[in-house]
Amino acid sequence: GNILGRLNPETGEMKEYTLPSGTYAHSVSLDKNQTPWFLGNKNGTVGYLDLKTEKFKVYKMPDKNARDPHTGVFDDAGIFWFTLQHSNMIGRLNPKSGDIKLATLPTKGSRPYGIKLDSSGTPWVSCNGSNCLVKVDKNTMELSEIKLPGAKTHTRRLAITPDDMVFYVNSGMGKLGRYNPKNGKITLWDNPSGENS
């Protein structure tokens, strides 16, 4: 559907808000004020719901090729970082100015999917279409690609520990991986259910 839902966990009451036409949000992220931001996966937008006025504010991508915002995360400065999977891009939105910057991944078809921040606020991105992780320079948006072992490797989601170890699920090979940015070492563990898990 094309709906944003708000659940009151104390009462169980659910309130639904119809999103702008064609949005079809893939995910929702909360900023430091608990304002819900959505990523318009079908219409190239990012936006939020003002909980006081119950009205939407929508930002259109500045590039027509940036068509599918996917997953997002806020840094401590309030900057919203997000992936655009099939557009093969990473985005950066400054909510104060509305300025959006985009960067294209170096490998065609990488399909950036999940995004997390390390302890310094540096964004890390998983590649669902290629065997890579991508580190984003938070100041310049320069992208550094880390090649992961295995041509069948595809990663959707990441988790980063307090000491900045980057864990990822290798859904293409049924493994759990860990990348150590300090020494470049990659460690892999088999999932209990095997390579098709």
Question: Where is each model-derived feature located?
Answer:
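Conserved beta-strand positions in repeat-built beta-propeller and related beta-rich domains
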Residues: 1, 36-42, 80-86, 123-129, ...
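A generic tandem-repeat structural signature
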Residues: 1-3, 24-29, 38-48
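Short intrinsically disordered, low-complexity coil segments enriched in acidic
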Residues: 1-15, 52, 195-197
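A short loop-to-beta-strand structural motif that recurs across blades of beta-propeller domains
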Residues: 2-6, 45-48, 89-92, 132-135, ...
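Short loop/turn segments that connect beta-strands within beta-propeller blades
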Residues: 8-12, 50-54, 94-98, 137-141, ...
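A short beta-strand motif characteristic of beta-propeller blades
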Residues: 13-18, 55-61, 99-105, 142-148, ...
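Beta-rich, blade/repeat-based domains predominating
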Residues: 21-34, 64-77, 107-126, 150-165, ...
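Ankyrin-repeat and related helical/solenoid repeat scaffolds used for protein-protein interactions
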Residues: 172-197
